[in-house]
Structures are given as structure tokens and as C-alpha cells.
Amino acid sequence: YHKQLTKETQLSKFNQTEIEAMLGSYTKVLFIRDPFQRLIATFLQGMGSSPSFSSFVQDVLDSGTHNASVAWKPLVSLCRPCLIPYDYVVMFGFHRQELGHLLQKAGLPVESILPEFTDTQVQWTYRWLSEQMFSELSVQQKKQLSHFYHWDLAAFSFSSSFLSD
């Protein structure tokens, strides 16, 4: 796009014509992650001050979607998948396969660019962590989290998410 963009420029700062021109001139890639896994990662990184995962989840639920941190805010409110026609959606845990396809489509040499991913190990680890953390939550918290991330679960195929159950 012909305008100079700074790192801080948000799409909402442009008028509709400029937005359409920009979106039409870029390849749009969206990286997504299961919302429950995002919560676990945020908790493990110490971004909440809660002593337990259950109390952290309660803090998240109490904050609501409008006051939520970007770390756990529902994806649909951050990246607007219904408004922006993304060309590629890359799901966490499938980086090697999906990024390889994306690089190939872009005409770039796949094997020489991609780092070594351990997607299978990551999937197994997060499955185990999800089971452990999910068991700490009350039935009410589980229901509230499913509601909190309802639109993410509807917009993206997180079929193995604990929140989908």
C-alpha cells in the first residue's frame, strides 16, 4: 500500500476506502490458538497475579470481555475475522505444516527458511496441561469460560478444545 505506515498505526485510523485498498493489497495471515491454551500460557507466564489457575480464571471472567487483557481477550474481538477476509489462518500446533504451505504459495524455499518445529510435542504437552488445569475449575467456571469464548469457538475449528465440550 502506498502510504507509509508506522508500527503503531491501527487500521481503524484510516477511512473505508483506504482500509479496502490496504486489505486488498496484502496477504492477510491470522495466527490463532485455542482460547483455553491461551489462558494456560498466560497463567504460566505469570501475567496474572493469582496464586492458582482457578483464581486466575475467575479474575479473567470477572474482568469481562471489554476490560480483558489482549493476552486472553476473545480472538474475534481482536482480529475481526468476520470483517477481514484473511487469506490464511494458521493454528498453533500446526506451524510446520501450515507455514510450509504458506511459504510454498509465496514461492519461497520452504526447507531452508523454516526452523525445526515440535508441533506433535507441543500438542501433547498442551493436551496434558489442559486436562490438569481444566480439572481445577468448577462446573460454573467451565460454563462461564465456554460462554466467554463462545464466538471464538464458533468462528474457528477448535474441535479438541476443552471449552467445546
Regions found by a protein language model. Give the residues of each.
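Membrane-interface amphipathic segments in extracytoplasmic regions
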Residues: 1-165
